[in-house]
Design a protein with these regions (language model features):
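C-terminal edge and immediately downstream basic/flexible tail or linker adjoining helix-turn-helix-like DNA-binding
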Residues: 2-6, 134-135, 152-172
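Helix-turn-helix DNA-binding motif, specifically the short coil turn and the N-cap/start of the second
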Residues: 27, 128, 137-142
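A short, charge-rich alpha-helical start-of-domain segment used by transcription regulators
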Residues: 1-19, 29-32, 43
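Arg/Lys-rich amphipathic alpha helix in sigma70-family domain 2
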Residues: 48-50, 61-82, 96-97, 156
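Short, aromatic/basic-enriched loop-to-helix "N-cap" motif that marks the start
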Residues: 15, 45-61, 140
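A short pre-motif secondary-structure segment
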Residues: 118-122
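Internal acidic/polar
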Residues: 77-106, 128, 168-171
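Structural recognition of an alpha-helix C-terminal capping motif at a helix-to-coil junction
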Residues: 33-40, 53-65
Length: 172
C-alpha cells in the first residue's frame, strides 16, 4: 500500500487522470469508471511497482492500457462530438478565435484514438517524448513520427484553420 506521501501524490494526480480519461472516452461517466478501474488496478499491483518508476507515468500507463483493454473487450466504443460545450468564459475575444477553437476541437475529435492520445499526453499533460515512449512501450523515434503525423492530420482535418508553425520546438 502507498505511504502517506505517495497517497498525497496519488490524490493530486486524480484530476489529471480524469481529464485524460475524459478526452479518451468522451463521456464523463465512462471517464470516472476508467479512472476508478485504473486506480483499483494500481492499488492491487502496488507491491509490484518499481520504486524508481515515476508514479505519474505509471498511473497514466495503467489508465491508457485499461482504456485499450476496455475498448477491445467491449467492441462498441463510439464517441460523439455532436455538440460542443460552450466555454466557461462569457465570450471569446474575437469571432476568429472562436472559429479556430471550434475547428480545432472538431478536427481533434476526428483523429484516431492513437493520434488523440499522443497529442493529449504531450501537449496537454506535458509528458516528454521519452516518457510517452516509455508509457506506450515504443521507441522515441516512433513517438516523434506519430506525433508529427498526428499534428499534420489535425491541420488537414481542420481545413487549414490551424496555422502551420514556422519554427518547430523539440522536447527532450
Amino acid at each position: 500500500m502507498p505511504s502517506t506521501d505517495q497517497d498525497d501524490q496519488l490524490r493530486e494526480l486524480i484530476p489529471r487522470l480524469r481529464r485524460f480519461a475524459l478526452w479518451l472516452t468522451r463521456d464523463a461517466h465512462a471517464a470516472d469508471d476508467l479512472v476508478q478501474s485504473a486506480l483499483e488496478r494500481a492499488l492491487s499491483r502496488w507491491s509490484s511497482r518499481r520504486d524508481d518508476a515515476s508514479l505519474r507515468s505509471w498511473l497514466f500507463t495503467i489508465l491508457y492500457r485499461r482504456f485499450l483493454d476496455g475498448k477491445r473487450s467491449a467492441k462498441r466504443y463510439a464517441w460523439l462530438l455532436g455538440r460542443l460545450q460552450e466555454p466557461d468564459e462569457p465570450h471569446w475575444p474575437s469571432a476568429e478565435r472562436e472559429f479556430t477553437a471550434r475547428a480545432t476541437l472538431e478536427a481533434f475529435g476526428r483523429l484516431s484514438d492513437e493520434q488523440r492520445s499522443l497529442l493529449l499526453l504531450v501537449a496537454v499533460e506535458g509528458f516528454s517524448y521519452r516518457e510517452v515512449a516509455d508509457l506506450l512501450d515504443v521507441p522515441i523515434g516512433t513517438v516523434m513520427s506519430r506525433l508529427s503525423r498526428a499534428r499534420q492530420a489535425l491541420r488537414q482535418l481542420s481545413d487549414g484553420e490551424i496555422p502551420v508553425p514556422s519554427l518547430r520546438l523539440m522536447k527532450k
